[in-house]
Structure formats: C-alpha cells, structure tokens
Amino acid sequence: MNKQSIELLLDDCDSDEPTRQAGAILDLVDAEVYEAAPKIVRLLKSPDAAIRFTAAEALGYLGSEEVETVGPALMNLLDDEEELVRSEAVEALGDIDYTPAVESIEYLLRKDPSALVRASAAETLGYLGKSQAINTLELSLLDTNEDEAVRCYAANSIGLLGTPQLLPKLENYLNSELPLSVKAELLGAKYWLGAKEDIAKLVNLLDKADEDFAQHILTILTDLAEREEQPTLAKDAPDLERVLRAIANRFPFTGNQAEKILALTD
C-alpha cells in the first residue's frame, strides 16, 4: 500500500463516521500498517462499542511495536460496559504479550459476570506465560458453578504454564467429577507436560465420541500437533491414524481437520 493510500485511511480513522473508521481499521490491519497503532489507540475511547471492539482487535495485530503505549490503553477497556469489548481487549493483550496485565486478567477470570470474558481470560493467561496464574486457573477449573468452556480453557492454560511437577495433581483432577470435555483438555495438558501415555487415552475418547465431542478433541489434537517442533503424536498414539480416518468417515464435516492433524504428525 502506498503512502497516499495509508494517509487516506488514517484520515478516515480521524473522521466522526464509524463506518469509515471501521473500514479504515480493517484495511490498515490487512496492509500490516504497524505505524497506524497510535492512531488506532485513540479509537479505543470511541463512544461506539463496535469501534472500540474493532480497534482493540486491530491492536492485537498492529500493537506489538508500541507495546508500552498500546498495553495500558487496552487495559483501560477491561472494565468496559460491553462484554465483547472486554473480551477482545483481553485477547489483544495476549496477542501483544503484555505481561503487566496478568493480575488484572486473573481478576476478570474469577470476577467478570460474562462467561465470554472469563473464557478469554482463561485462554489468554496461558499465552502470557506467567506461572503465577496457575492457582487462579485451578480455581476456575475446579469451580462446579463455572461455565464449561471456561473450565476447558483453564485446563489447557495450566498445561501451557505448568511443569511436570504438576502431573500428580492433574491426575487427581482427572479422576474427580469433571465434565468429559474438561477431562479431554486435562489429558492434553498432561501429555504436553510429559505424560506421554495420555495421548492414547485422548485418542480412545475420540474413537467413541459423538460429532460435537469429536470436534472438540480434534481441536485439542490440532493444537498439540501445531506446538510440537518434532512431531511425536503418532508415535505416542499408534491408533491415531486409524481413529482419525474412522472419525472422518463417520462425520464427514471433520475430514479436513483430521487430514490436517495427519499432515502435521507425518
């Protein structure tokens, strides 16, 4: 994109017309115009919730070179009146790796009234890489009144933040009364922390799953496969290919994801 086109988009950001602002933000993201971040930061204060949301989302992509400015500005949205804005601000903070936000995001995980925001918080804490959040994540994991999706994200993030020393505790959790989807996430977390035998257990769950649960497990397997520098999933779960092909045959909608996992683990 040439300089003149960029200037026109930046001018649109300064307009008072939300439609022009939204279109400009999206175009700046598509063109990877990182120098637009300071201009987009101003739109986090827009009276239009859709613009605040779009600006927060954009800064997750474009804010990495202005973290010291963008991070605090995004944190100001953590108490926004709109749950979609709060959720997007949390995710953008994770995208730019703004670790000073960890404590505030932990607070949202336990206290925000929106399950959407709590789910974003649980997921983002795993990406921010601060093990101090594990205790808060465990509280959400074990909270029987918590939304199931939030508990799933908490389990996954514990796997990202933990060490093998956590494995006995996670095994105890796995043997407790938990939703099956949360147990699947715990198996993935334990595998990532070194319990190699647990991937075969996860594949066994997949073999018996209905379509919705199969999709959930396929997402876990895809995530694990994408993280591995040296693929070991197929080695650790000898039945993986057979089960993936059976699932793809049983539920054709899952075929592309099954093939993706096979390609990643080849």
Pin down the residues of each PLM region:
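Short inter-helical turns and helix N-cap capping residues of alpha-solenoid HEAT/ARM repeat scaffolds
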Residues: D16-E17, P47-D48, E81-E82, P113-S114, ...
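N-terminal alpha-helical scaffold/docking segments in eukaryotic complex subunits
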Residues: M1-F53, G60-Y61, A225, A246-D266
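Long, ordered, amphipathic alpha-helical scaffolds
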Residues: P179-Y191, K196-D266
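Alpha-solenoid repeat junctions
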Residues: E32, L59-E66, L93, D97, ...
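Amphipathic alpha-helical scaffolding segments comprising HEAT/armadillo-like alpha-solenoid repeats
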Residues: M1-D12, A31-K45, S64-D79, Y98-K111, ...
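TPR/Sel1-like alpha-solenoid repeat signature
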Residues: L59, L77, A92-L93, L108, ...
